[in-house]
Design a protein with these regions (language model features):
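Short, contiguous hydrophobic alpha-helices characteristic of membrane insertion segments
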Residues: 9-10, 65, 116-117
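N-terminal helix-turn-helix DNA-binding core of bacterial DNA-binding proteins
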Residues: 10-53
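Amphipathic alpha-helical recognition patches that constitute DNA-binding helices
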Residues: 15, 19, 80, 84, ...
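Basic amphipathic alpha-helical segments that dock to polyanions
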Residues: 54-61
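Accessory beta->alpha helical hairpin/"wing" motif in late/C-terminal subdomains of nucleic-acid enzymes
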Residues: 85-89
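Amphipathic alpha-helical dimerization/coiled-coil segments
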Residues: 90-117
Length: 117
């Protein structure tokens, strides 16, 4: 697909929390900029998260107790909040992943269904 054909993806409600949890589970402690860059890289630039999208999700996940933020220094010696997934976050990731796969399977079945029969 050429870069002209790429259209940014709009996330469904609730999916951002899931992919942030997955990113932290697989990559360890990350600050918001690292999370956004990694998701953009993995999505081949189809997913571009701005601060107005990512930061509220990080605050929400921290309030749920699913991630924990601690202040530290970046490679460029700037202060940043590093996020890690908690044990409760690991459990939430597991259950939310199961729920997502169930929903994705249902949508796929419905898209393939011949409603004429």
């Amino acid at each position: 697909m050429s870069s002209e054909e790429k259209q940014p993806i709009q996330l469904l409600q609730g999916t951002l929390d899931l992919i942030v949890l997955r990113t932290l589970a697989s990559m360890g402690a990350q600050h918001a900029y690292q999370i956004a860059n990694r998701l953009q890289q993995i999505s081949d630039s189809l997913l571009n998260l701005n601060q107005g999208t990512l930061y509220p999700a990080l605050v929400r996940l921290e309030q749920y107790g699913w991630i924990k933020g601690t202040w530290g220094r970046t490679e460029s010696n700037r202060e940043a909040k590093y996020y890690t997934i908690t044990q409760a976050g690991e459990k939430a990731l597991s259950s939310e992943t199961t729920r997502w796969r169930t929903m994705a399977g249902l949508v796929e079945r419905l898209l393939l269904e011949d409603f004429q029969s």
